[in-house]
Each structure stands twice: as structure tokens, then as C-alpha cells.
Amino acid sequence: MGNSASRSDFEWVYTDQPHTQRRKEILAKYPAIKALMRPDPRLKWAVLVLVLVQMLACWLVRGLAWRWLLFWAYAFGGCVNHSLTLAIHDISHNAAFGTGRAARNRWLAVFANLPVGVPYAASFKKYHVDHHRYLGGDGLDVDVPTRLEGWFFCTPARKLLWLVLQPFFYSLRPLCVHPKAVTRMEVLNTLVQLAADLAIFALWGLKPVVYLLASSFLGLGLHPISGHFVAEHYMFLKGHETYSYYGPLNWITFNVGYHVEHHDFPSIPGYNLPLVRKIAPEYYDHLPQHHSWVKVLWDFVFEDSLGPYARVKRVYRLAKDGL
């Protein structure tokens, strides 16, 4: 392993994303999979429990020493808040109440956003649609790092820093790559979040607010669960741009590890994704997969072939009216 990543550009391809064709083939062969495209009634209750757990944690940490507050923010709060962000991910696909009740899904996402400390649920939904429709799309898929990230974060130390700062890159990258007009829902999301933060501060003081913010920053940064950010689409093997992970961390992440299955069928809630693989194993079992998100992070930092540039990119031709 050298001191600098060996890649100097993204992996440019001139083919369509593989998920579209695989989806057609699987549905033609196994039409019963359509029955999995239904709302998950468990999702709203899981969100309620996670939010209440963090509110209880806010009350418990109000008198803790700062060092212990930060410890629990990483060890416990980071897991809960990261789980909530993945609930928001599922909700962005209308998994809680179905496409016919979009408003209920949006407000559940805003509610799930409360322990995260900063408003982002409405913005996430706005951009996540493009991630699926234009996977790896130049100037469209804001999940792909910028050229500046690829150029600068090219050594083990810098890649480690990049992982620590993931929450900032995911928040700021859309504004640079594909800025969009602010929506009414984003404004409401912000107002509700600010009101919640102020209420927590008024009730229990500064420490619970810091606990929630630290839980988000630490839990979405250099954290075992954050391995999924890298595991999902970074090119560990040439020719493959999406990878699944079938390990135990799926239990607390709404099966986000079933990522190939998710991109094949975005309308299937995370709870049902294991059934997709069970019904159509010949489409998934032979694909390369990850077995440890921690190992993913280790390899990303120390393997020369990996870094922010290790992403597949393609150019999409859009209609004149844009998105």
C-alpha cells in the first residue's frame, strides 16, 4: 500500500445502471414480488420508539460530565440517530403509509428527524429520488463525491478525515453539485426542528442538545454503522457499482445492507427486502457482497485503489424541462 490513492478520476461508464434491467427480469420471472410493494406498518412504531428513547436519553444526560456525554453520544446515541436517518430513508420511499398518503410519510419523516438535531428529512427526500433515477449521474447524483473530494482525500490520513467529516459532505455536497429551490416542506421541517431544539434546551439545558447533535455527528461519521455509506456504491470490484451486506447490523438499520435489492426495488420497504433475495436467489447470491462494515472502512482508508474517486459515473441526457 502506498501513501496516495492510485485513482485520479472516477470510473466513467457508458451503460445504463444495472438495476433497471434486473428489475424487469425478476418481475417477469417472479411476479409475486409485486406483493412485497406495500407499506410497512411496523415502521411508524419503530420510529416512535426510537424518538422516545432519545428523549429519555436527553433527560438522563442532562447532569452527565461532558466526557461521559460524548462517550454515550458515540456508543449509544450515534446508533439510535443513525438508525433514525435510515428510517427516514425508508420513509422517503413512502414505505410507512404508501404512495397514496404522501403527506403522512413526509410528516413522519419530520418527526423522525427530531433527535437528529438539524433539519434534513425534507431535503433528503428531494435529492434521494435522483440518486435512484440517475445512479452515478454526473451533476445529478449527489451521493457521488465531488472532484475536489477525490483529488484531496487521497492518502490514508486524509481518507480517515473524510470519513470523520461525512455528515458535512452529505449536507453540503447537494448545494454545490445540484442546487435546487427550497421547498415549503423544507421550511416547515426547519421550523419544527428549531422549535424542538429550543424546547429541549428550555426543559433540560444545553447538554441534551449537544448530546443529540454529537450523536448525529459521531454516529454518521467514523462509526461502525457508517460503513454502509462506503459499502453501498464504492467500487471495491471493477464492474460492480452496488453491493449488499447481509450481516447483523441490518437488524438496527432497516435492512439498508440489502442495497442491491433496494435499488432493484425501491418501492419495497426495508423489512421485506430479505424476501426479494429469498424469492430470486439466483440474481443475488453470486454478486460480490460485504461481510463487515468495519472492514469496509478499514479497506477504504488503507487500500490504494479506494477513495472518493472509486465511484462509477455516467452522463444522463435529460429532458429540456430538467427534473
Curated annotation (Swiss-Prot):
Record flagged with keyword Lipid metabolism: yes
MF term (GO), any: sphingolipid delta-4 desaturase activity
InterPro entries with a match to the protein in the record: DES1/DES2 (IPR011388), FA_desaturase_dom (IPR005804), Sphingolipid_d4-desaturase_N (IPR013866)
Pathway involvement of the protein, from the record: Membrane lipid metabolism; sphingolipid biosynthesis
Protein family: Belongs to the fatty acid desaturase type 1 family. DEGS subfamily.
Main location as per UniProt: endoplasmic reticulum
Uppermost EC category: oxidoreductase
Catalytic reaction(s) noted: a dihydroceramide + 2 Fe(II)-[cytochrome b5] + O2 + 2 H(+) = a phytoceramide + 2 Fe(III)-[cytochrome b5] + H2O; an N-acylsphinganine + 2 Fe(II)-[cytochrome b5] + O2 + 2 H(+) = an N-acylsphing-4-enine + 2 Fe(III)-[cytochrome b5] + 2 H2O; N-octanoylsphinganine + 2 Fe(II)-[cytochrome b5] + O2 + 2 H(+) = N-octanoyl-4-hydroxysphinganine + 2 Fe(III)-[cytochrome b5] + H2O; an N-acylsphinganine + 2 Fe(II)-[cytochrome b5] + O2 + 2 H(+) = an N-acyl-(4R)-4-hydroxysphinganine + 2 Fe(III)-[cytochrome b5] + H2O
Residues spanned by motif Histidine box-1: 89-93
Protein name: Sphingolipid delta(4)-desaturase/C4-monooxygenase DES2
BP terms from Gene Ontology: ceramide biosynthetic process; sphinganine metabolic process; sphingolipid biosynthetic process
Task performed by this protein: Bifunctional enzyme which acts both as a sphingolipid delta(4)-desaturase and a sphingolipid C4-monooxygenase.
EC number of the protein: 1.14.18.5, 1.14.19.17
Residues that span the membrane, as ranges: 45-65, 68-88, 210-231
Tissue spec. comment: Highly expressed in skin, intestine and kidney.
GO CC annotation, single: endoplasmic reticulum membrane
Lipid-substituted positions (N-myristoyl glycine): 2
